[in-house]
């Protein structure tokens, strides 16, 4: 199948709008991606004609809604090549998935004197839950340091492991730098030291295929809204043997087997014991449509197009005076930069006046900002619906801002 960016763009209604009298150039998909009509229509159709509470309902609408929900679990398992759909838990997003692991597996397996390893490039969602766990139990948090080029100092990693290391939690792709970490060698090393591995895949799954069996990670988590799906829905993958051992994190309906005031409560089996309460069924339906959409386009086709676009963007940005780029030459999805000594917010505001949407701030990565000694960065992210013309507009906009601000 030949990838056609024009055909893809036609599926995204918002891309036809104007901002400040100019065509929208949406370069903020790493924060949240836009939604194709196929996703919008699937969720709307469910609410119009198929909505009902799932599980245990004997009537037709409930049974059909339950079947649709579980079919999305199956589709998601195929999307990341899990062994079984029952290794996947529906969560609100990457943040909740990581917190679930920290509060369920972490509380049961991390003790005083143990340690957890993260990296200096992590999103706060893959830092704060582990800080909280370490504070609760008296464990130590260890950090893989950064190199100036935005890669990790992996030569230091063997020295961070010891017999007390319980977990390595690491991002697949940095949300600021675009660095893709060499997970295969990292995971192998962690397992050699008896540690489990959690991978934050929020910035990876939309850019190329992910195979959790080939990676051999113990946990993998991602959000639907960055994958052209709805907000409020994500996937947590856990190896089946681990998932079966994990206690529930939240209590309520749907996750129980029996409830007795005198004899206590027993849990249903995984993954459903981690899905307390009424699920975001509409969001799940929308996620299924998003998975179907990108799978039909072909993730390898998407990857090839996006990499060509990234190479073009990096080459064109060389023409912008006083532009500082952060991250390695080989990267996925994002370009973080600052223009001279101007604050990122000012640069982003000027770009918005030109109809160009970028993200500004610390990007939920304050330790990374501290490493580069800056309060904020601008970040342009490139998705499958972005074009060479939009890159040209970004470059022209930055050149114009440089002339205006000096």
UniProtKB/Swiss-Prot annotation:
Catalytic activity entry: (sulfur carrier)-H + L-cysteine = (sulfur carrier)-SH + L-alanine; L-selenocysteine + AH2 = hydrogenselenide + L-alanine + A + H(+)
UniProt-listed Pfam families: Aminotran_5 (PF00266)
GO terms under cellular component: cytoplasm
Gene this protein is translated from: sufS
Similarity comment: family membership: Belongs to the class-V pyridoxal-phosphate-dependent aminotransferase family. Csd subfamily.
A GO BP annotation: cysteine metabolic process
Location(s) in or outside the cell: Cytoplasm
Gene3D superfamilies per record: Aspartate Aminotransferase, domain 1, Type I PLP-dependent aspartate aminotransferase-like (Major domain)
Residues recorded as bearing N6-(pyridoxal phosphate)lysine in the entry: 226
Database matches in NCBIfam families: PRK09295.1 (NF006791), sufS (TIGR01979)
The keyword Membrane is annotated on this UniProt entry: no
Cofactor(s) the protein requires to work: pyridoxal 5'-phosphate
Pathway info: Cofactor biosynthesis; iron-sulfur cluster biosynthesis
Oligomer and partners: Homodimer. Interacts with SufE and the SufBCD complex composed of SufB, SufC and SufD. The interaction with SufE is required to mediate the direct transfer of the sulfur atom from the S-sulfanylcysteine.
EC number, as in UniProt: 2.8.1.7, 4.4.1.16
GO terms assigned for molecular function: cysteine desulfurase activity; pyridoxal phosphate binding; selenocysteine lyase activity
Function: Cysteine desulfurases mobilize the sulfur from L-cysteine to yield L-alanine, an essential step in sulfur metabolism for biosynthesis of a variety of sulfur-containing biomolecules. Component of the suf operon, which is activated and required under specific conditions such as oxidative stress and iron limitation. Acts as a potent selenocysteine lyase in vitro, that mobilizes selenium from L-selenocysteine. Selenocysteine lyase activity is however unsure in vivo.
Record's keyword terms, sorted: Cytoplasm, Lyase, Pyridoxal phosphate, Transferase
Record protein name field: Cysteine desulfurase
Ranges that cross the membrane: none
């Amino acid at each position: 199948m030949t990838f056609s960016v024009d055909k893809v763009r036609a599926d995204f209604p918002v891309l036809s709008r104007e901002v400040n009298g100019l065509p929208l150039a949406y370069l903020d998909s790493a924060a949240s991606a836009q939604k194709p009509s196929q996703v919008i229509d699937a969720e709307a159709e469910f609410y119009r004609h198929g909505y009902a509470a799932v599980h245990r309902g004997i009537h037709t609408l409930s049974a059909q809604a339950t079947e649709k929900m579980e079919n999305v679990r199956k589709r998601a398992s195929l999307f990341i090549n899990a062994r079984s759909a029952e290794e996947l838990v529906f969560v609100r997003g990457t943040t909740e998935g990581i917190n679930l692991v920290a509060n369920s597996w972490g509380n049961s397996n991390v003790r005083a004197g143990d340690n957890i390893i993260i990296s200096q490039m992590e999103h706060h969602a893959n830092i704060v839950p582990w800080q909280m766990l370490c504070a609760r139990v008296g464990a130590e948090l260890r950090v893989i340091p950064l190199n100036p080029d935005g890669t990790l100092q992996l030569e230091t990693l063997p020295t961070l492991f010891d017999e007390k290391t319980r977990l390595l939690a690491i991002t697949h792709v940095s949300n600021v730098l675009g660095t893709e970490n060499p997970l295969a060698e990292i995971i192998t090393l962690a397992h050699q030291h008896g540690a489990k591995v959690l991978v934050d895949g929020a910035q990876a799954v939309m850019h190329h295929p992910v195979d959790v069996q080939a990676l051999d990670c113990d946990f993998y988590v991602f959000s639907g809204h960055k994958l052209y799906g709805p907000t409020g829905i994500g996937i947590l993958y856990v190896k089946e043997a681990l998932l079966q051992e994990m206690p529930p994190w939240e209590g309520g309906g749907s996750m129980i087997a029996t409830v007795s005031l005198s004899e206590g409560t027993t849990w249903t089996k995984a993954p459903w014991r981690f899905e307390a309460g009424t699920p975001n069924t509409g969001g799940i339906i929308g996620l299924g449509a998003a998975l179907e959409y990108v799978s039909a386009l072909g993730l390898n086709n998407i990857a090839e197009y996006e990499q060509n676009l990234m190479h073009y963007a990096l080459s064109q940005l060389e023409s912008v005076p006083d532009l500082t780029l952060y991250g390695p030459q080989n990267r996925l999805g994002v370009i973080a930069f600052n223009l001279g000594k101007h604050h990122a917010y000012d640069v982003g505001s000027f770009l918005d006046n030109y109809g160009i949407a970028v993200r500004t701030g610390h990007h939920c990565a304050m330790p990374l900002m501290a490493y580069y000694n800056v309060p904020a960065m601008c970040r342009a992210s490139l998705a499958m619906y972005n074009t060479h013309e939009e890159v040209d507009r970004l470059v022209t906009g930055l050149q114009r801002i440089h002339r205006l601000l000096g």
